[in-house]
A protein has these predicted regions:
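Bacterial Sec-dependent N-terminal signal peptides
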Residues: 1-53
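Glycoside hydrolase catalytic-domain context in secreted enzymes
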Residues: 46-814, 825-833, 837
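Flexible, membrane-facing loop/turn or short amphipathic-helix motifs
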Residues: 817-819
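Short beta-strand elements
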Residues: 838-853
Length: 853
């Protein structure tokens, strides 16, 4: 109420200043104006009252923000809006460095550099190449080297005292450091910030599935695995542990969760989100934000962190499948699905959001006032701050060509609603933004709004009172309790897709383990694991078990033969493979009872993970085909971040397990599951395609699946899937019965209570993800064939029955109509759980005037 009263007062004052003359000559006319203005103000505040602030306002905290803001100079305000990379404050030296020019050539080609650039680089001296590439986490050296990074205190002084920089990010060389190193670096940064500015720095790291950049911390399965668990409690616990270990490292801000809907399997960041569905992403992001930030986003304690939900929004749908390329998304799809998880994040209280690097329908998101300010800040009353991704304001002129130069790009982005620029290597942002303010091209009110949002986040994190955390009180860093949580998440995330009676695999059998993913931690961890691309995981994960090591522990080393047949070229791009040695694997098969083929992908992320062919590599498929000729039963283990096509080898396997990217304990989890010491309970978080030109999602339009039409023309549109979204097997069986809905007829304001009985009819204990779908049978625009509306996960002992109940607001069955408005139409809907269905009737059409319902 206080907030609304303040708004009312401010609106009245502003309108009176604008419309009422300073000298009143006609009292009657003036009073009439005032009455009209009061009505207008009441209407304005009534509209605002319909949308509560995403995070409830704390009056005392807001007063502190305003007091700090009032003391700041323009230079200090602009400095708060800049985020620099830590690398610019130090220097990397490489001991025993001798450059391998073929590696340099390979690295540059992998990152898309032109032939001329590559030729010019390899002609430089060793030291010149090291100066240009040494800070990056790429291997360009002959033999063993040691990379040493040292903070330059004088440079740090200059950047904070002169340029007033308010945020720093990243790890030196994008490589993991120790807890002690993080403590030392960030404490020094905070000392300088408090000394020169009286305002703490907000330090950010990509701790995407655990403490990516802190050696010795806990890494969890990647987000795509958490999506496969359909268990929000695991998402919450993983985030809670990551927050604790981040704060132990003195890092208060993480660039996570990721809720870009992974609806295109070609995209190289599929595995960084929770999958293709909006509801799964929405429920998971709400759980993770609570785990990261705690119960009160206004007062985040020293064991929790601020979140930066990313990448707002539509980032996961590039038209070409290539990272950071344009997306073309219908208004309906954009509002109904791609926006929904970010709305959930805002309402869950995420402190910040990171913005989509690309464009939607020709408009760069960094340049869109509609998306940044209207949809997010105004419509949702979200008061966090928006940060760019890596140098993305620059891309408005260098790549997107919507600005003539950097200054113009800054003007466009800041006026659109960007609050902080991640401009990693330059302070030019400060110079140019100050010029824009002085020229009147960016208003002081826009600057104050951005800085107010940044200060608010710093106060909410408690950084003004205690800029540093870590040391005493963080003894649980990397403890067994956290390891068990990671193992449980891995066990619940690995999906059994096929089992022709071969699993569980009895002990005492001789096993051939083959394939490029058989003995590598890098593949189990994926990108954002100790380094940006995850390419150095082997050096920092010696205490964890590869698939080979885990199977040796489970079945006995004497029963496991390792002959990979195909291996990755670790000096090349993620997809590069060495010359195959399939004949060796085939020869080894003669000595065993069963073959486990661990195949899939090496680690990657972002642009280096782009692909030109969704099929699994020819070498790996040939390996399976040749092994199948031996007649020995094959178990396929897919270790991949996106669904690589395997339609030609799946029929050759007796069982298929997709472990996705399961993290530190993924190998141990697999061994437990294969042996039957744990039970499979995961379900596919995305649709697994069978064919290269049939990349459907589960909620495809009904017109995408049509048979023969009357007459001569055969429409024959078919959805061809390898495995559908939500599919996954178990060692036990579940029976659904008694699907009930408390209302057969409903209106938009109703809540439908949907219940179903689930019984474990098998001989093993198991967990089951229960999924509630709806279908709109007839609509004014082509309806989806079905939509997931809710889910939960339950544990059942053999013979046990539980009743699962969902509360489904009827308005959730609405869609965005052709005019861009939410609409619930009169007509019939089908609710479905398992194979059971119930028909319900909407008795009255409703169209909403608000952008969100």
């Amino acid at each position: 109420m206080l907030f609304q009263k303040v708004v009312f007062y401010l609106v009245i004052c502003s309108l009176i200043r604008i419309f009422v003359p300073k000298k009143i000559t006609n009292k009657k006319k003036t009073m009439k104006k005032v009455l009209i203005l009061m009505v207008m103000a009441c209407a304005a505040t009534a509209v605002m009252a319909q949308v509560k602030p995403a995070i409830p306002r704390d009056v005392a905290l807001e007063a502190k923000v305003e007091k700090t803001l009032a003391k700041m100079t323009l230079d200090e305000k602009i400095g708060q809006m800049l985020e620099l990379n830590l690398d610019v404050m130090g220097k990397t030296t490489v001991e025993n460095a001798k450059v391998d020019r073929e590696k340099v050539r390979s690295v540059l080609q992998q990152y898309g550099r032109s032939a001329q650039e590559v030729d010019a680089m390899v002609k430089l001296s060793d030291q010149e190449i090291i100066d240009k590439l040494g800070a990056f986490p790429v291997d360009i050296y002959q033999g063993e080297t040691k990379r040493v990074w040292k903070l330059n205190e004088q440079m740090l002084d200059t950047l904070i005292s002169k340029w007033k920089v308010g945020s720093i990010l990243n790890a030196p060389g994008s490589s993991a450091a120790t807890v002690d190193q993080w403590q030392k670096w960030i404490r020094l940064i905070q000392e300088k910030s408090m000394k020169y500015l009286g305002i703490p720095d907000i330090y950010g790291l990509d701790h995407n599935h655990g403490v990516t950049y802190t050696a010795g911390g806990t890494l969890f399965p990647q987000p795509i695995n958490l999506g496969a668990t359909f268990n929000t409690e695991l998402a919450f616990r993983g985030a809670e542990i990551t927050a604790y270990e981040s704060r132990a490292s003195n890092c208060p801000w993480v660039y996570n969760p990721v809720v870009d809907l992974s609806r295109d399997p070609r995209w190289p960041r599929v595995w960084e989100s929770f999958g293709e569905d909006a509801i799964v992403n929405s429920k998971m992001v709400a759980a993770e934000i609570k785990g990261y930030q705690g119960d009160d986003p206004n007062h985040i304690d020293g064991f929790h962190v601020g979140t930066s939900t990313k990448h707002y929004f539509g980032y996961g749908a590039p038209w070409t499948g290539k990272d950071r390329t344009p997306a073309y998304i219908s208004p309906q799809l954009l509002r109904e699905k791609y926006f929904e998880p970010f709305k959930a994040a805002a309402l869950a209280g995420t402190l910040t959001m990171m913005v989509n690097s690309a464009s939607i329908n020709g408009v760069p998101v960094h340049a869109s006032y509609e998306y940044l300010t209207k949809w997010l800040k105004e419509d949702l009353q979200w008061d966090g701050f928006l940060v760019t991704d890596w140098a993305d304001i620059n891309n408005l002129y260098s790549r997107e060509k919507v600005a003539k130069d950097k200054k113009d790009a800054i003007r466009i982005a800041i006026n659109a609603g960007i609050d902080m620029s991640m401009d990693p290597y330059s302070v030019e942002f400060c110079i140019l933004l100050k010029e824009l303010v002085n020229e009147g091209k960016v208003s002081m009110s826009r600057i104050d709004d951005a800085v107010r949002r940044i200060l608010r986040a710093k106060y909410r994190l408690g950084l003004f009172d205690e800029p540093n955390t870590g040391g005493k009180g963080y003894e649980k860093f990397g403890c067994d309790e956290f390891a068990k949580a990671s193992l449980q998440a891995a066990e619940e995330s690995e999906v059994l897709l096929k089992n022709d009676g071969i699993l569980p695999l009895a002990k005492g059998k001789k096993i051939l383990l083959t394939g490029p993913n058989a003995n590598q931690m890098r593949c189990l961890h994926g990108g954002w694991s100790y380094t940006w691309q995850g390419s150095k995981a082997e050096n920092l994960s010696e205490k964890y078990n590869t698939i080979y090591e885990a199977l040796c522990n489970k079945y006995g080393k004497e029963n496991i033969i390792l002959e990979q047949g195909v291996t990755y070229n670790e000096n090349g791009a993620y997809y590069d493979e060495n010359a195959p040695e399939i004949d060796k694997a085939v020869a080894a098969a003669a000595q065993v009872d069963v073959i486990i083929a661990a195949i899939g992908e090496n680690s990657y992320t972002e642009t280096p993970g782009n692909l030109t062919d969704l099929w699994l590599s020819e070498n790996q498929r040939n390996l399976v085909k040749e092994l199948a000729k031996t007649g020995k039963p094959i178990i396929l283990v897919l270790n991949e971040g996106r669904p690589r096509l395997i339609a030609d080898i799946e029929p050759l396997a007796k069982a298929v397990v997709d472990i996705l990217i399961p993290g530190n304990y993924g190998g141990d989890a697999l061994a437990n599951l294969l042996a039957g010491d744990a039970n499979f309970s995961a379900k596919m978080p995305y649709t697994y395609p069978r064919e290269i030109n049939s990349l459907n999602t589960y909620d495809y339009k009904v017109s995408e699946e049509v048979g023969t039409m009357a007459g001569a023309y055969n429409y024959d549109a078919k959805v061809s899937l390898q495995w559908p979204f939500g599919y996954g097997l178990s060692y036990t069986t579940f029976e659904y019965a008694n699907l009930k809905v408390d209302k057969s007829s409903f209106t938009a304001d109703d809540i439908l209570t949907v219940s179903v009985d689930v019984k474990n009819t098998g001989a093993r204990a198991g967990k089951e993800a229960v999924l509630l779908y709806s279908s709109d049978l007839v609509a004014s625009i082509v309806p989806d064939n079905k939509r997931l509306r809710d889910f939960t996960k339950i544990a059942l002992q053999p013979g046990e029955t539980k009743t699962v109940t969902f509360q489904l607001p009827a308005k959730n069955l609405a869609f965005v109509n052709a005019e861009g408005r939410w609409m619930l139409e009169e007509g019939e809907f089908v609710l479905k759980i398992g194979k059971l269905t119930q028909n319900v009737q909407c008795s009255q059409t409703k169209v909403w005037d608000t952008p969100n319902i």
